[in-house]
Every structure is written in C-alpha cells, then in structure tokens.
C-alpha cells in the first residue's frame, strides 16, 4: 500500500504543468527552430553592437511570446502534444531548407510543395536533411512524448490558458515597444525576414493556399477566346508548325548566345536564331510562372484575379489548330487539361529513361507518329506542340544530362548543393544548359525536315531562373519582390524557318534589333497568337513581340 502510494505521488510530481510545455516548446522553436532567421539577422548591417543585441533579444521575445500565445489556445491535455509535434516537425523541415538553400516559405513555396512529384521529392533527400530533422524535430518530439503532462480540471486549465495568453500579450507589447524603432525599420527594409519566422511562415502560407480558391468569384473556368480564328492559308502556303519549348529553371545569363563567357550553346550559335536578353519572368517558380505565361491577364492582373480563365492552349484549340502538350516535368499546372497530352514518365527507353525519369530528348521520340494521331482536319490549319522540359531542374542538376554532356568539370554530384563548391554547382548547371542547347538544336533539325509540308518555327522560353550560391542562395522560389534577378531573367529564343518568315512576313533583321528590349512573360500569350496568325478579341498587338516586325504582305 505504501509502495503504491509512493509511486503514484512520484508520478504526480514528475508530471509537468501544461503551461511549461507551451513556454519551453516556444523557446525551442524560437531559438533552434529559427536558426535560418537568426543567421539572416546576424548579417544585417543594422544589427550590430549593443543595440543590435537588444533588437535580437526583443525580436526573439516577440516570436517566443507569439508562439506561446497561439499554443495557449490549443493547450488542452490530449491536444497539446500532437499540436507541438506538428510545430516541431514543420519547423525542422522548414529550418533545413531555409538554412541550406536560402529559400523562404510563402504561399508560392507551399504550392510548389503540394505539386511536387515523388521523383522531385527524392531529389531533395540527403543525410543532412535527415540529421536536421532528427535534431530539430524528432529529438524534441521524443522528449515531449516521454514527459507526462499534469492533469488539470478543465476550468483550471482554461484559467491557466487565459493567464498564459495574457502574459504572452504583455511580453509581445513590452518587447515591441522596447525595440519598436529598430523593429519597424528592419522589417520594412528587409521584408524577407517575415517569411523566415518558423513555423508561423508555413502555417500562414498554408492558410493562404487553402483560402485562395474561396477568394474567386466563380469556381468554374470562364471561357476565353471563343472567337479565335486562324487566318486562311494562301494556295502556296503550308500549315504552320509551331514548337513551343517551355524551359525549366534556365538562367538567361548562362547562355553562350547571350554573351556568357562559356560555350554553353555551341549548337544554337550555328543556327539563325533571335535571342532576346531583356525578358523578366512572371514568377520565380513553375507553379506560378506557367499558368501566368499562358494567361491573357499578365502578371499584375493574374496575381489579383478573382476568376479562373481558359488558357492560351484553350484558345489555340478554339481556333481549330491541332494542339499537343508533351510533358517531361511535373505537369502543366492546369493549362493543358483540355487538349491531348503525352507524359514521358509513362515511357520506357533503354538509354533515355531510367527509374521513371527521362532526358529531354525523349520528347522528340516518335514525334511524327504523335502528330499523325491528331485530328487531320485540325492539322490542315496548323499544329502547335508544347514541350515542357526537365531542363535545369535542381538541386540534382547532374541527373538532367547524359554522361557525354558533362563537359564542365568538376561538377556537383550531390543534391545537397551546400556540400559542393560554387564552381562545382555552376559547372553542373552549365552542363544542363549545354544539354538544352543540344535538345533545341535537335528539335530545330526535326523541324527543318518537315519544311516540305509545313511552315515550321520554334519558340523557347524558360519559366524562371535560378540562384547558384550567390549570397548563399540556391534554387528559386523567393517572393518576387525580394528575389534576385538571376531567378527572374529568362531566355527567349526564336527560330523561324525561311518558309515561316516568308508566310508570316516577319523580318529577321527587325527582330534582331529587339535583342535588349525590356520584355516580360506578359508578352508570351500575345506573341504566340501572333506567330500563329490568330485573330481574337483577347489578342493585344502591342504585347506581341513580333507584331511590328511584319511586312505588309
């Protein structure tokens, strides 16, 4: 009897008060869970000396108290541990990616995560990530679940939660007043910091993604360009064949044809191309840029849209053209759902495919047969092929190229880019551009072979750029307003066959003069309609890159 009573008493005394879980959990999250944030804060020129230290302490107190305030609403005996587990694991994963790749977490990044396929996810896995998750996430979770919680009556628990919440608010107010001048100035001048507060950044971003569909006035897709018509061909004309190559993660500045010091585009240099160097992307991720590129709205209106509309691909289809989307990436992000599609992950090829991932060349495989399978009455009006590249998708750049394209050495053969020197990272990336150069050249050769029966042309534009270690930033996906230009400047390369130039009246020398013209993805929608000679109320000639370079036929 005495022994049993002693054990019960001991168990009771070893149990922790629920408020301690909230406070200590918040301290862990605000410190170790926010290493990426504190590294950024430490590098700020404004944060130095005693005043800088005071700001860091005040900022840390605000984060800790804010987390404690949130947890005070959720601090119920059977609910607290699962909630803290989610907080710890979310913070651990966020901390790893922010610290190692220099990314921030916003709604666009959460959208990228949701749309990531299995292969992309595996490319991000490495031992560094495992250790980070174990130390920052699993370790506190293990401690949490090993420690008993003191049982309180619900009225007592409610009172304690209110007390904890009030105390948290007082700390937030007090700390904010103490560092208000520095806090307001730093947060205004360094807006990226708000995307680093972990794990609140993830929870806020998830909330924005969940709420976004409800912000639209109409959940259905609104029709667009139903009046689209292709200009009638003259007796001597051939049906246009336009190949749209949607590049992936290609930096404009790493193309030899754009002045890069390395010969990354030897094949394109042999062709009669027009390369535009002043193009800015719509976003810094595929999930943002691709739907925006194929929208009539343009970047600003697309971001604030209240409705979803049919895309450029739909309008090409409405015009009666034969349209085919070939995807070697993670999908078309909704823009090609109403036209025929071919997914390369379903293919098997002894040299071009391995473990469900294919080199971009596979999209040229059996292409003639694919076109012949499209409706004949549409092919007589013209064909538009879209090829969505794997391109330079990171971080495993080395996986994107066959062995005979590993020209620039030494290369980084790891998906943990921070383990490699910047030279190795750049070499690996440049090898992907070298392979893209070869792929585009092969596509042009295929188009040339069809010139007897078609009027062929090619347009290559990338969705966004990439950071390769500049300022300790890797990959892409930073909020547009704080993203460096290397994530936003994209290549725009046009090849026109002699027949296409003649039929369309496009003047090559005029187009060459546009090399440094400031353009954006807003021009893409209207330029494609212009290339295919499609009339529609949604077409804006002023946004068509090629419009003022047409002769009067």
Predicted segments with their positions:
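Active-site-proximal alpha/beta segments of enzymes that process anionic O-linked groups
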Residues: 176-244, 249-413, 489, 516, ...
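Catalytic cores of PAPS-dependent sulfotransferases
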Residues: 73-82, 86, 315-325, 373-376, ...
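Active-site-flanking alpha-helical
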Residues: 255, 444, 470
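Transmembrane and membrane-interface helices of multi-pass
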Residues: 2-196
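Flexible internal linker/loop segments at domain or repeat junctions
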Residues: 403-424, 500-508
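Active-site rim elements
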Residues: 190-196, 301-302, 351-354, 422-437, ...
């Amino acid at each position: 009897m005495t022994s049993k009573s002693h054990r019960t008493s001991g168990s009771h005394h070893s149990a922790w008060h629920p408020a301690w879980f909230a406070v200590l959990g918040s301290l862990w999250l605000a410190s170790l869970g926010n290493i990426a944030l504190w590294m950024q804060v430490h590098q700020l020129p404004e944060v130095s000396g005693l005043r800088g230290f005071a700001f860091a302490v005040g900022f840390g107190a605000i984060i800790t108290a804010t987390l404690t305030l949130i947890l005070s609403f959720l601090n119920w005996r059977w609910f607290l541990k699962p909630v803290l587990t989610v907080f710890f694991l979310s913070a651990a994963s966020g901390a790893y990616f922010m610290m190692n790749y220099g990314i921030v977490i916003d709604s666009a990044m959460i959208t990228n995560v949701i749309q990531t396929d299995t292969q992309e996810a595996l490319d991000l896995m490495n031992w560094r990530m495992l250790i980070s998750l174990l130390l920052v996430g699993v370790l506190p979770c293990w401690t949490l679940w090993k420690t008993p919680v003191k049982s309180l009556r619900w009225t007592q628990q409610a009172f304690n939660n209110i007390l904890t919440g009030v105390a948290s608010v007082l700390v937030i107010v007090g700390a904010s007043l103490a560092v208000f001048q520095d806090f307001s100035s730093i947060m205004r001048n360094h807006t990226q910091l708000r995307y680093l507060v972990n794990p609140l950044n993830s929870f806020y971003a998830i909330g924005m993604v969940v709420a976004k569909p409800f912000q639209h006035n109409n959940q259905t897709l609104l029709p667009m360009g139903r009046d689209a018509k292709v200009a009638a061909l003259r007796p001597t004309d051939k049906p246009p064949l336009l190949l749209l190559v949607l590049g992936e993660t290609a930096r404009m500045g790493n193309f030899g044809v754009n002045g890069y010091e390395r010969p990354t585009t030897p094949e394109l240099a042999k062709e009669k191309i027009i390369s535009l160097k002043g193009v800015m992307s719509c976003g810094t991720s595929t999930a943002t840029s691709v739907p925006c590129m194929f929208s009539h709205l343009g970047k600003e209106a697309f971001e604030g849209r209240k409705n979803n509309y049919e895309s450029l691909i739909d309008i090409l289809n409405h015009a009666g053209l034969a349209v085919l989307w070939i995807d070697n990436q993670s999908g078309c992000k909704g823009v090609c759902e109403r036209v025929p599609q071919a997914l390369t992950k379903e293919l098997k090829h002894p040299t071009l495919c391995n473990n469900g991932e294919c080199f971009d060349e596979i999209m040229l495989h059996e292409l003639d047969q694919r076109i012949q399978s499209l409706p004949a009455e549409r092919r007589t009006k013209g064909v538009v092929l879209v090829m969505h590249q794997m391109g330079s998708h990171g971080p495993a750049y080395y996986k994107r190229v066959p062995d005979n394209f590993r020209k620039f050495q030494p290369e980084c053969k790891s998906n943990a880019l921070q383990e490699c020197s910047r030279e190795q990272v750049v070499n690996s990336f440049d090898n992907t551009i070298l392979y893209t150069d070869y792929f585009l050249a092969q596509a042009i050769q295929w188009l040339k072979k069809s010139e007897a029966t078609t009027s062929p042309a090619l347009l290559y534009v990338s969705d966004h750029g990439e950071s390769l270690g500049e300022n300790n930033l890797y990959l892409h996906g930073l909020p547009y307003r704080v993203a460096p230009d290397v994530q936003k400047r994209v290549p725009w390369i046009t090849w026109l066959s002699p027949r296409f130039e003649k039929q369309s009246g496009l003047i090559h020398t005029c187009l060459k003069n546009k090399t440094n013209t400031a353009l954006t993805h807003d021009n893409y929608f209207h330029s494609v309609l212009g290339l295919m000679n499609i009339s529609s109320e949604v077409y804006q000639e002023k946004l068509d890159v090629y419009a003022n370079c047409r002769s009067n036929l």
